């Protein structure tokens, strides 16, 4: 069973115990890892459970259409050099899965959290991440996450609500650039991959035109006013001569 953190309220301590019991039962009955049910039970008992549970953690939130799990593992591995890390590396990336990951983070003060794109604002509101990692956006599983423009807005909301956080963002994807651009501290990275097939129209106005050195914006119609950021940001970190 998971040890109850001392900083939790009485209600959340009950929720923690119930969630741990639900997870244990799920695994004992062969109904799965319990990565979701434990968090769901805890949240039903204490709606403020995630906020209380996450308070002692310094967290990194990783999101995007592709590469979330791999990147989260890489972040976890890097953070482990400084001590134990809580992480949902098995892909339970909605709110309940994040809760379970933190519940299992014995002796950890850091967390590497994979988060579903549409859950970023809600999770970030409770976790208060120090770093967001925004990978890419594309039309994947639209029945689950909705139109790509709606997803971009969710990521923009998530980052904008935490101006003190650092956003590590893929500057090759115009949709990710739009989602991250308002934050004061953005680290632009480029991997050289052909992201952006779903970003012919830029969410803040204009159309995306592509060239050998990246992308830039052009008016979608005569007289259209373009946003301040009109082209691919210059990356601070990038990969060269690497087959991806």
Please place each PLM-identified region on the residue numbering:
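Gly/Thr-rich phosphate-binding beta-strand-loop-beta motif of the actin/hexokinase/Hsp70
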Residues: 214
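Long, charge-rich boundary regions
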Residues: 223-244
């Amino acid at each position: 069973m998971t040890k109850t953190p001392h900083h939790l309220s009485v209600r959340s301590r009950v929720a923690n115990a119930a969630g741990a019991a639900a997870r244990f039962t799920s695994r004992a009955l062969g109904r799965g890892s319990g990565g979701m049910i434990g968090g769901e039970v805890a949240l039903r008992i204490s709606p403020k459970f995630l906020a209380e549970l996450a308070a002692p953690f310094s967290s990194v939130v990783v999101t995007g259409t592709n590469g979330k799990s791999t990147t989260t593992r890489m972040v976890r591995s890097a953070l482990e050099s400084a001590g134990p890390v809580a992480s949902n590396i098995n892909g339970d990336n909605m709110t309940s899965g994040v809760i379970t990951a933190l519940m299992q983070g014995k002796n950890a003060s850091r967390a590497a959290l994979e988060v579903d794109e549409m859950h970023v604002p809600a999770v970030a509101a409770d976790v208060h991440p120090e770093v967001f990692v925004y990978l890419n956006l594309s039309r994947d599983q639209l029945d689950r996450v909705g139109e790509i423009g709606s997803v971009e807005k969710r990521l923009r909301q998530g980052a904008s609500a935490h101006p003190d956080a650092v956003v590590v963002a893929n500057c090759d994807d115009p949709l990710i650039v739009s989602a991250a651009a308002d934050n004061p501290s953005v680290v632009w990275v480029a991997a050289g991959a052909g992201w952006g097939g779903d970003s012919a129209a830029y969410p803040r106005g204009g159309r995306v035109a592509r060239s050998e050195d990246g992308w830039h914006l052009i008016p979608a119609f005569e007289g259209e006013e373009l946003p301040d950021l009109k082209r691919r940001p210059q990356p601070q970190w990038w990969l060269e001569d690497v087959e991806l």
